């Protein structure tokens, strides 16, 4: 039986989650208004995980080091608020998404790749014939911050191999809205 891990970084506070068949899931605090540098790893069976940092045995022996109680408490509070406000946030982001789609729909030669019924907090758009870097610069002059990559892969020189395999070119940008 394979270990089923879910990268839930974009999920917490944005989509309802059912974790019955998940062996592990990870979240990043800053994606739901926690502090940067915080994360959560939930594992169904901690015996399956080998520690990478050895020492005092904190964090159930999986990650030794002094526990930052203040950061942990703030992370739990941010998580509670994100889950509590999920429906309200999705309603607001759906409205933003609709307005942005309507505005972008006025421009010829521009494609919205995200389906109408997709997650309301992410929008993938393409401008055939225009490189992503040019789009980022043009939008930034309008004080609209967009990216051609995720923050965790922004140092890469080339397009993500998975996106290339999906036939996605470098003329697309992804817009993700957060807890505004």
Positions of PLM-derived features:
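Conserved PLP phosphate-binding loop immediately N-terminal to the Schiff-base lysine helix
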Residues: 1-28
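Active-site PLP attachment segment
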Residues: 21-59, 64-76
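A short linear hydrophobic-aromatic micro-motif
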Residues: 25, 109-113, 146-150
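Conserved PLP-dependent catalytic core of the aminotransferase class-I/II
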Residues: 83-135
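Predominant activation on well-ordered alpha-helical scaffold segments within soluble catalytic domains
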Residues: 69-80, 101, 136, 140, ...
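Conserved small/polar residues in nucleotide/adenosyl-binding loops
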Residues: 178-179
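Conserved C-terminal alpha-helix-loop-beta "cap" of PLP-dependent enzymes
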Residues: 123-173
């Amino acid at each position: 039986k394979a270990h089923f891990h879910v990268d839930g970084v974009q999920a917490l506070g944005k989509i309802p989650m059912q974790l019955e068949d998940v062996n592990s899931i990870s979240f990043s605090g800053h994606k739901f208004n926690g502090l940067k540098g915080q994360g959560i790893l939930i594992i169904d069976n901690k015996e399956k995980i080998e520690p990478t940092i050895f020492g005092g045995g904190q964090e159930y022996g999986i990650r030794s080091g002094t526990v930052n109680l203040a950061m942990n408490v703030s992370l739990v509070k941010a998580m509670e608020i994100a889950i509590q406000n999920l429906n309200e946030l999705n309603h607001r982001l759906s409205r933003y998404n609709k307005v942005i789609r309507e505005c972008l729909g006025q421009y010829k030669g521009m494609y919205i790749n995200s389906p109408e019924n997709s997650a309301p907090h992410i929008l993938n758009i393409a401008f055939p014939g225009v490189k992503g870097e040019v789009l980022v610069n043009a939008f930034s002059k309008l004080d609209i911050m967009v990216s051609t990559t995720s923050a965790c892969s922004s140092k890469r020189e080339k397009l993500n191999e998975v996106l290339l395999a999906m036939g996605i070119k470098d003329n697309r940008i992804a817009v993700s809205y957060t807890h505004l």
